[in-house]
């Protein structure tokens, strides 16, 4: 089986034995996006990867191909909800877990201009329409559907709101490509993302990827299974499941976190066994879920290098003298480090991207002193935000920079993300560490539907490469 990830910068391939799950080889090539004149094809880079693999493994030339893609801008999703703090926020989380980049979140208070911009300037690939709990208010999602149409939207819509309004909403949007799924927030404090996540994947394959004009060859759409972040998150879920049942782990696993440092964004995927308090309404109206993905659009190695420097400087992670390096990388996204000094600059930008992205995903825990009691003592309350990752057992580093920097440098970056935080950041405290330098997680996500046993074995092989953090 030949598993392919068409990325925005690199096309990565992994050749896997479909019976045993053994990784036979991997190769990468710059992603070949077609030019404005129509020349070139995204499959040119793939052909180069397959030819390279076939030199050592002749069966690669005829292997079955499964692919995912974030090339050409990936999957852009706009969320339309009712209450910003409930259904709109729930929709945003579902969109992220579906592998999309959220480009707009509209709610009841959004004005007419925002809906006009949706069709004219924002131009998402898919609109996710939510609103209302089951048995609750039906007007919100119906109004959202009307406002989408009034703004001139004619693209795909996934409806995942109050089930009582599905027929009316379906009638309103009947002329659009539409899929109606179960409510993502059936009741307050409950988030059910899976049905909508599957519908968004189907929309991506049926209506989105072909419109990006990445290839003129029919085999491109035939090999695609979904958006890259969606398949990677699926791979992380498989990895977490295997760790829980793997006797070699020696104990019950509490979770997995993956930090993926890209050129434009830094993504964090987590699958964590939740504390019962966290699964309910103790902190959030929209419940925390075991499977979470966050995307930081201002953190990255190239296109977002300057905003990474700004964020890193604000948090005391980067110095002023790194700014010229960040400016150069943002202006030249194809830049590759050639000297020790340039590699050291990449290391600093990567470490800042990963650290800040992980902090935003995990949040922090801190003691808040309240009002004095009758006895004269002040009450003390632990205030927590984000998702508690402190007991996570495995921390995985991914992304081109961690593959291309020297191994010891990549390990140093990953090691810096763990440990007890004096500032209360809920980062992994004592995890094992592993670098995904062979594109394994995307391959696991691609394989699991067709070859579940091979996917599980491949995931286990990655976990068994884990190391203990340096002291």
Residue spans for each PLM region:
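Long, internal scaffold/assembly segments composed of regular secondary structure
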Residues: 225-311
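Asp-based phosphoryl-transfer active-site loop
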Residues: 2-12, 70, 260-266, 395-398
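Short glycine-rich, Thr/Ser-proximal phosphate-binding strand/loop in the N-terminal lobe
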Residues: 10-40, 97-101, 281-305
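A glycine- and small/hydrophobic-rich beta-loop-beta segment
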Residues: 308-373
